[in-house]
Amino acid sequence: MSAKLIKGTEIREEILKEIEAEVKEIKEKHGKVPGLVTILVGESPASISYVTLKIQTAHRVGFKEVQDSQPVDISEADLLALIDKYNKDDSIHGILVQLPLPKHIDEKKVLNAIDPDKDVDGFHPVNVGRLMIGGSEVKFPPCTPAGIQEMIVRAGVETSGAEVVVVGRSNIVGKPIANMMLQKGPGANATVTVVHTRTKNMDEHCKRADILIVAAGVPGLVKPEWIKPGACVIDVGVNRVGEKPSAKDPNKMVAILSGDVDFDAAKEIAGSITPVPGGVGPMTITMLMLNTLKSLKFKLGLI
């Protein structure tokens, strides 16, 4: 029997509708809307595409959206001054700097210059510390881990007391989702194991998992025999493994994407599983919108 598909595309639509409704209500009662600025340095096609998607989504849910494009040769000092301007702008509640930045700019210095109360990506050291403490201290959880947790909750997967195995220890996904699953609350209270490139007998750890979260960036790393029957499998990996003609235009080639899990085989064993694409990916920008809305609500004293 095939596993239940946990589709990020469907959950995204549910959440965006909820955000849009709440934005309208806050605007009617308080005369304010969330403001999100995305700072883009240079003209990388991939970065432009991603920023455009963020701006379009912000517009859709009723935010004030600002795309601030800067030349690739902007100085570090000028970029820091720009961030300081938005830190002081009361109409802006979320500040994003699209990465990567040019080599002459210190990314760490730039990201740390963002006001932690406007750091809706959740990567400022202050917000990382808040996440570690947990509970009411958490303001802005990192977007991809937050999306994973939201998918698990909305799919009705029991986490309390569950064995969770996280494959990967990155600061962006692995470490934060492991910490979030340990916390008290919905989508948490789990017993968590993190495995990585130096882990011995990785497959034996994975076989214990009631919930297996894979964020290694290695296509097909997790084999079907690693999966516990009935487990929930969250595949965070998005790997380009080739090209194929586009269905819309056969003369145009598009990427073939693969996750970190052997999906076709795994779906015959797992109880539920995320597809690639269409699984975790759509949730990242969605949770970015939710964090920006939360920033305004913090400002208004609504939470």
Curated annotation (Swiss-Prot):
Classification via CDD domains: NAD_bind_m-THF_DH_Cyclohyd (cd01080)
Keywords: Amino-acid biosynthesis, Histidine biosynthesis, Hydrolase, Methionine biosynthesis, Multifunctional enzyme, NADP, One-carbon metabolism, Oxidoreductase, Purine biosynthesis
Catalytic activity, as annotated: (6R)-5,10-methylene-5,6,7,8-tetrahydrofolate + NADP(+) = (6R)-5,10-methenyltetrahydrofolate + NADPH; (6R)-5,10-methenyltetrahydrofolate + H2O = (6R)-10-formyltetrahydrofolate + H(+)
Record InterPro entries: Aminoacid_DH-like_N_sf, NAD(P)-bd_dom_sf, THF_DH/CycHdrlase, THF_DH/CycHdrlase_cat_dom, THF_DH/CycHdrlase_CS, THF_DH/CycHdrlase_NAD-bd_dom
UniProt pathway: One-carbon metabolism; tetrahydrofolate interconversion
GO cellular component: cytosol
Domain of life, per lineage: Bacteria
Family as reported in the entry's similarity comment: Belongs to the tetrahydrofolate dehydrogenase/cyclohydrolase family.
Stored HAMAP family: THF_DHG_CYH
Described function: Catalyzes the oxidation of 5,10-methylenetetrahydrofolate to 5,10-methenyltetrahydrofolate and then the hydrolysis of 5,10-methenyltetrahydrofolate to 10-formyltetrahydrofolate.
Protein name: Bifunctional protein FolD
Species annotation: Desulfosudis oleivorans (strain DSM 6200 / JCM 39069 / Hxd3)
